[in-house]
Amino acid sequence: MWVYLNGEILEADKAKISPLDRSSTFGDGVYEVIPSYNKKLFLFDEHLARLKSSLNKTFIPIPSELNDLKDILKELHTKNNFINQSFYIQISRGVQNIRNHQAAIDTIPTVFITSQDLETNPFRENPCRKGLKVRLEDDIRWQRCDIKTTALMGNILSMHNPSLDKVDEVILFK
């Protein structure tokens, strides 16, 4: 599988993100997922606008890569060669050698993009054909659900609660 990391398209096992990246130490990053059906990006402009909105609301500088995002996704699409795939785009505030809530002013955002085949998901039957089993739960996360942050512990806890039935997805609501 091929991924994009900070200006390079490379094989996934060659991609290395620093353990000092603020996405690891603080969950300090945002993400967006853009699906592609029959090799066509779905609602690209709307997803890009939401990604930029999350970046602006978290004061993470908008990386120049976003100007070429469509071309980057097309190249990944070709290299990974899935007809239907989803692109996960994660942008963190970047690497900081000294752990501190205050980010250094010269921190450069880390841009990471990967994709996966929408036809096969080892965690559930094909949702494109069979549908999903879901559960509704109160949203107990922080109050800024308008920002797609990489800190998804609330979602993870909902999926792993052993006292509840197994589902494909949990829909959180306020």
Residues of each region from the PLM?
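Ordered, amphipathic secondary-structure segments that act as subunit-interaction surfaces
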Residues: T78-I91, I98
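Helix-start/capping segments and mature chain N-termini
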Residues: M1-E75, N97, H101-K174
